[in-house]
Amino acid sequence: MPSPIRLIFTELCALSSSAALAQTPAAAPQPPPTSPLTIRIGDADFLIGGFLDAMAIVRSTNVGSGAPTTFSTIPFENTAPGNLHETRLTSQTSRVNLLVTAKVGAASVRSLLEIDFLGGGPGNAFVTANSHAPRMRLGWAEYSRGKFDFIGGQAWTLLAPNRSGLSPVTPDVVTSQNLDANLQLGLVWARQTQFRFVAHPSKTIAAGVSIENPQPFVGGAVVLPESFPESEVDNGGTPGAPSPYPDIIGKVAFDPQTGETRQHFEAAFVVRGFRTYSSASDRTFSATGTGFSFSAVIQPAKSVHLIGTTLISDGGGRYMIGQAPDFMVNADASITTIGSTSAMGGVEAQVKPSTMIFGYYGTVRIDREVASDGSQAIGYGIAGAPGANRSIDEMTVGVNHAFFREPRYGAMLLIMQYSHVKRTPWSVPDGTPASARTNLVYVTVRYVLP
């Protein structure tokens, strides 16, 4: 039998332990994170995102451009590249991004930095180490207060068609479901530094104007006057070509809701400035490029989206994935803008919760502008120049299937794309086919971070 003193001591210890537990405050319940990769620092949320690709690319001709397809230089079937198939396995298209969001009084701030690995790399990149260089895709910040937004940084151009509103976020921009890093012919797009101002007078209407980085693009297919310095324009390898002022882009969007579906309609314009100088006459020449765009994303059923977009321009070819020149230079160094039109139509259908099928048809049409520099023909589309395209067309079909998709684990996707591309020059040498064609197959297994 335990002694009375020992029993009293045991009871006192138990009471002391109960009192201590009663005085210890219970830990406050923490809200579950919106994503396993969300980190809260101060009053800002840092979300790490992106995906990892294991991609196979097969082309019926040797385009020679790596993961992105250079549509404007598809080789002819009477050349060696036109008779050689291309096979490539790569993970260059993998992406990493960081999204930061915060509240600042009555305003909200968010910023995004995104990189992939399609930057310029060494010539022997595929020999041993496959050390692909990272590059900045997007890097912007947005300040929103009330009915107004301000965006600054490198973002999708305002001229690119939106799916809803005028948001710079990639899911709100029509970029297609394609795996090709050059997306889809007929789409208008660029990622460039800008200062964008957007107003939302109502839930269904948005209007914006953007001041964006310019670049006077002529490409390699425009023949310049013999005495004209190539450094005054971008011939595909002159990033420092001068521009008199930024590109000015405006857009209005209308997003009505019809039952459970939403529609999107928009109209946009672009104004661009070009300038050249002639040392022979000590004169400066100027020209203005313009373009008008109309786009729609129609949802006839909740699981189906119909997409249509077009850009009609006189001096806006750079925005057509660089497939068309902005202008040509005359013998006296004056400027003649070149007309070009792009258009794309497509359908995206979620046939099952885990499976989407998609298809697009896109085209780019480019006008011919030719002059003479003494006895030499100059401009775009001169006789016997197979690099000056009259039209380029692309038909695409594909499927996107999710093996699983869960916020805690991310998603594992199988995506396949088949495309047929045809380019038709204004003129070809004797014995050369009238057009060049290639077939593209892209297949990737993609893990999307949670």
Predicted regions and their residues:
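Outer-membrane beta-barrel translocator domains and adjoining extracellular loop/strand segments
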Residues: 61-66, 122-132, 163-170, 218-236, ...
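Detector for outer-membrane/organellar transmembrane beta-barrel domains
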Residues: 250, 258-397
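Outer membrane beta-barrel
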Residues: 32-68, 78-225, 244-257, 297-312, ...
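Transmembrane beta-strand segments that form the barrel wall of outer-membrane beta-barrel proteins
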Residues: 110-119, 213, 266-273, 363-364, ...
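Transmembrane beta-barrel outer-membrane domains
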Residues: 41-43, 87-93, 129-136, 186-190, ...
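Outer-membrane beta-barrel proteins
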Residues: 38, 84-88, 129, 140, ...
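Cleavable N-terminal export/targeting peptides
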Residues: 1-30
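Outer-membrane beta-barrel "beta-signal"
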Residues: 399, 435-450
